[in-house]
Amino acid sequence: MSRYRGPRFKKIRRLGALPGLTSKRPRAGSDLRNQSRAGKKSQYRIRLEEKQKLRFHYGLTERQLLKYVRIAAKAKGSTGQVLLQLLEMRLDNILFRLGMASTIPRARQLVNHRHILVNGRIVDIPSYRCKPRDIITAKDEQKSRVMIQNSLDSFPQEELPKHLTLHPFQYKGLVNHIIDSKWIGLKINELLVVEYYSRQT
């Protein structure tokens, strides 16, 4: 299944706020109206919607998300928590959380078009897994810096998660440590996502 490129507002109206996909938010009460029209949801539907929420927020294909679930299942610790950490430490998401891109699709464009360096080297793979002490910077070109500055200008600094440090005037971000679960930027029940995939096998 390919990455979603359709109407974004339609998705947030059904699934709730997806800040990685779009800065728009559903109108107050719209999710309650949708629930009343749809009636009581089945457990399968609830798990499916949590999975879709995760997929659309991080901009993943079905195959990519399944791959992350399998990696998380083999790691030590809670599968759901490890899954969220893996997704949060992707380069495209780190750029978004730093405020260097307004959405994850925008961050992916910056990476694909070679505007971003990690530890002084250009990285053009959005799924690159960032590590503690990684230094993320904009390429030293006017075009790269203008694109990032536009995002930084509208980014509320108080929303910067604790595992990251931003130096806006240097167009530089630092990864201090692996993200703590309370700083995940999405309202999600990750256990339902794990359950969804465990029931598919």
UniProtKB/Swiss-Prot annotation:
One of its GO terms (biological process) is translation. It comes from the Eukaryota. Pfam families: Ribosomal_S4, S4. It comes from Populus trichocarpa (Western balsam poplar). Part of the 30S ribosomal subunit. Contacts protein S5. The interaction surface between S4 and S5 is involved in control of translational fidelity. One of its GO terms (molecular function) is rRNA binding. GO terms for cellular component: chloroplast; small ribosomal subunit. Residues 20-43 are annotated as: Disordered. PANTHER family: 30S 40S RIBOSOMAL PROTEIN (PTHR11831), SMALL RIBOSOMAL SUBUNIT PROTEIN US4M (PTHR11831:SF4). This is Small ribosomal subunit protein uS4c. It is found in: Plastid, Chloroplast. Its main location: plastid. PROSITE patterns: RIBOSOMAL_S4, S4.
